[in-house]
Amino acid sequence: MAQQGKVEPQDQDSFLDDQPGIRPIPSFDDMPLHQNLLRGIYSHGFEKPSSIQQRAIVPFTRGGDIIAQAQSGTGKTGAFSIGLLQRLDFRHNVLQGLVLSPTRELALQTAEVITRIGEFLAEGNSSFCATFVGGTRVQDDYRKLQAGSIVAVGTPGRVVDVTKRGAMRTEHLRVLVLDEADEMLSQGFAEQIYEIFRYLPKEIQVALFSATMPDDVLELTKKFMRDPTRILVKRESLTLEGIKQYFIAVEEEHKLDTLMDLYETVSIAQSVIFANTRRKVDWLAQQLNQSNHTVSCMHSEMPKQDREKVMSTFRNGSSRVLVTTDLVARGIDVHHVNIVINFDLPTNKESYLHRIGRGGRYGRKGVAINFVTQKDVEVLREIESHYHTQIDELPVDFAAYLGE
């Protein structure tokens, strides 16, 4: 995990602090947190709370519903992990906290953060935080729950499954967190989320966290949240600070050659290349590897073991280029990515923000390069308008920008 002291916090004016009770708390020591939780926070490498952590943790610990929005790479996972852990009673080995994530990779990563921060609270219960995701045996899920899990982190489909089977007892649940809430409440997941709510205690605390919070999602929350504290970002503040955004005008048949030229021109620490389809990802990775550019690729139809291996080699730096679909656009935490390339522009505005957030995480500088065909121009203009930003054409002396 990156040192939180190196985060360049969002400016306070970026937030719509329009509700009483929201004020930045600049130090973890000034928050109402258990001493053993503070030990876990500092041992995990956190130094100073980021802007979203300064605003969201204390309202979370009060027990009320909360809707919190912050840009990618600014510490959302840390914010809800700390708030969640403070709300639990570790004297009782019953399931008290549930975190739902849209992908298994994000669920595994979140569970790792919660486990590390909660290490001293758990006092020897190494299985206090368990994951429930597809691609694993249901019998293993049973064993995790019987071992005394206090926090469950999972994907909606698997959580629905183990709950319906009676393996996951929900009567003692205190807190539900929806990570990447806009995705979780989209059509693909909404039905499963509502199914899970059928099993939850009526008075459960609900917390929503995401980089984007569209109006239709906020409208949906009225169905299952009670007078939530809202910590939202002004739309004009949603473009990621520290990430320079460019476009290259190129037609489809010349994209590959343009990408090759780009990699021969500049020195890149690590990069993520996004394409819109599984077939395009496989094809692009094959073409790059054949041209002696060592790359790895990942998409949702790959076996889970292969996806985990790809992410592991990319995280530890063995692989420097990852070609993928939007599968990793949400929250996958790789610290040394300095360039994100949209080989295909995303199909919606929210995905753009999640994608370019892979570069420049935790205050580091990053670059986003968009390949734009003639038919993409209107989409690019919509992105600029939506985020009140300007995406310039890639300069000829681009290589010099990486050294700044």
From Swiss-Prot:
Domain Helicase ATP-binding stretches: 57-231
InterPro entries assigned to the protein according to its UniProt record, in alphabetical order: DEAD/DEAH_box_helicase_dom, DEAD_box_RNA_helicase, Helicase_ATP-bd, Helicase_C-like, P-loop_NTPase, RNA-helicase_DEAD-box_CS, RNA_helicase_DEAD_Q_motif
Known EC number: 3.6.4.13
UniProt GO MF annotations: ATP binding; ATP hydrolysis activity; RNA binding; RNA helicase activity; translation initiation factor activity
Keyword vocabulary terms for this entry: ATP-binding, Helicase, Hydrolase, Initiation factor, Nucleotide-binding, Protein biosynthesis, RNA-binding
Origin superkingdom: Eukaryota
Catalyzed reactions per annotation: ATP + H2O = ADP + phosphate + H(+)
CDD domains: DEADc_EIF4A (cd17939), SF2_C_DEAD (cd18787)
Record region (Disordered): 1-28
Record flagged with keyword RNA-binding: yes
Family, similarity comment: Belongs to the DEAD box helicase family. eIF4A subfamily.
Subunit structure: eIF4F is a multi-subunit complex, the composition of which varies with external and internal environmental conditions. It is composed of at least EIF4A, EIF4E and EIF4G.
Name of the protein in its database record: Probable eukaryotic initiation factor 4A
